Amino acid sequence: MFSTLQDKLHRDRSDRVLTLPQPTAPALAVTSFFEYLVVVSLGKKRGQGTYEPQITYQFPKLANMERSQREEEEKSLKAILLFCFPEGVNWAPLTEYPSETFSFVLTEVDGSRRNGYCRRLLPHGKGARAPEVYCIISRVACFGLFSKIFDEVEKRRQISMAMIYPFMQSLREAPFPAPGNTVQIKSFIPESGTEIISLTRPLDSWLEHVDFRTLFRCLTDEEVLKVFASTVLERRIIFMAEELSTLSQVLHAVAALLYPFTWQHTFISIVPSVLIDVVMAPTPYLLGVQRNKLDDVIDQSDVCVCVCVLCLIGDESTILPEKLQEELLQALCCRRDNSTSEELNKVVSEAFLSFFVKTVGHFSSHVKRSSGRQPGVFQKKSFCKASEHKASQHFVKRFIQTQMFDIFIQEVERRPTQEGFFHKKIAEYQESKKKEKAK
């Protein structure tokens, strides 16, 4: 299925970038901010008018890693080069270029994921020159935190490349904070002296990588609901925009709407030009494609294409129960135009979480267990019949066939006791229903 795509990328198993439907591996305990930083520059090919990306700086060096780890990372670096300059190699030197921040995900063969955070900028200097990319690879999913880190990196880069090392070394040695906590990094800058940089981790860990502002700036509330409907049924969805930062922020925002469920299929927030054949895959995907590639994807008749162009299959407005659609729209109307990122995240996440509470929040009552410690068995039929309304039943019957629900319920079957924010919201909803009945 991906033979053409894989031939372009590798012949050395670096297809890890596009590993297809694999259950997401359990999250590893994160103890540090990042694994390594690379600087990717554009070097002109000899005798040709094109450029090729190349790594000009890395911290820490691969030489400091064990051999097996070094070999794996060398494969990853080939993919990283593509994602730092996804447009390809047809660049011309520039005198002005507004810096932009974007991200991508590296998926390992076992389903575990690492995040690539990028800041692309024009290096300090005179005359026309090619932009360069600073890319941080991390197990941490926290876009806002790394945007602030890049601000500090960029500030030091304008002074000297050598100023980046001590800052990144201090960051690497700092412990990764718990949700809601702050860590302070000391860093020296000539003429400014020692600065203390405070990095605060968001309290809601599943929203660390998310800023919903871009999504709702690009799409209306009604369009967001149509995209959400396509996503919960695991369809093929392509997002298109000119800016890399818009693509990565929109894709991560859409994936976050699924909480407590997790997208289990191909997820590429920015598709490099050489990988554009991925749009022809018959399996579900969430892809971000730059607008100049519109002709390569628009003829895919059963694909939902969003952001700059909205091409839908046609049934999106009928997928979600009508009453719950109205409730979602009402909840989204509660946000203010001048809301902070945190305020908007709260309104949006709670609105969509409430949707799942009302449609599938009764799942635990339909997992039969022979004893407390034994794995349970999910009773699909009784679960579907127990839906509050007929419209919800129709949606639930379709939703339980998705891989994201299947993976979620497998975890429920394995673990007798369930804790977490979703379960807390279910308990609150069930308690409110009891009080209503008692009136």
Labelled PLM ranges:
Residues 2-439:
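Acidic, Ser/Thr/Pro/Gly-enriched alpha-helical scaffold modules and adjacent low-complexity linkers
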